[in-house]
């Protein structure tokens, strides 16, 4: 995770790409992370949630309604529901109701289309990446750029996923120890 970047006082401020370059590409996509790295990010900060089959993927929250094309996908209309996440009720489609294979058929969209209108040009172009794909991608970007690029993952809604039988911590640790 490039811990060495934090051991010495850096010559310049470190740049952390929260959700990647989410002002320029749909958040939490490899394209968003690539743009952030190209623009000089030292760290990529992916938020992680779990699919029904226990695979960690990058999404800011468990509800897919605002960041994917799921609402336009009739084959998944019956999965719309209402769930309590982190003490609040949310209505939509939830990542833990989809297997990774199903999730990979969805495409990312801009979460704030009225604010970041330029990002809507990329709607439907990118898949939701897994944690392992992100690790591999950032490692390849580090090698290609000749500089260390770190990862600062955030496990989202841990209690919600634990109660669903999908404890994020165990999955995260098993990936890191593999």
Q: What residue ranges belong to the model's regions?
A:
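Phosphate-group recognition and catalysis centered on beta-loop-alpha active-site segments
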Residues: 1-178
């Amino acid at each position: 995770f490039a811990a060495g970047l934090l051991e010495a006082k850096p010559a310049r401020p470190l740049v952390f790409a929260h959700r990647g370059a989410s002002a320029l590409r749909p958040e939490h996509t490899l394209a968003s992370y690539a743009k952030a790295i190209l623009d000089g990010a030292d760290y990529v900060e992916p938020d992680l949630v779990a699919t029904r089959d226990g695979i960690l993927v990058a999404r800011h929250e468990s509800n897919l309604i605002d960041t994917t094309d799921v609402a336009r996908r009739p084959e998944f209309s019956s999965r719309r529901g209402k769930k309590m996440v982190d003490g609040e009720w949310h209505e939509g489609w939830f990542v833990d109701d989809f297997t990774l294979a199903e999730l990979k058929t969805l495409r990312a969209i801009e979460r704030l289309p009225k604010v970041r209108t330029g990002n809507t040009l990329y709607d439907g172009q990118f898949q939701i990446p897994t944690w392992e794909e992100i690790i591999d991608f950032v490692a390849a970007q580090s090698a290609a750029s000749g500089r260390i690029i770190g990862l600062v993952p955030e496990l989202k809604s841990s209690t919600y996923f634990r109660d669903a039988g999908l404890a994020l911590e165990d999955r995260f640790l098993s990936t890191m120890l593999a």
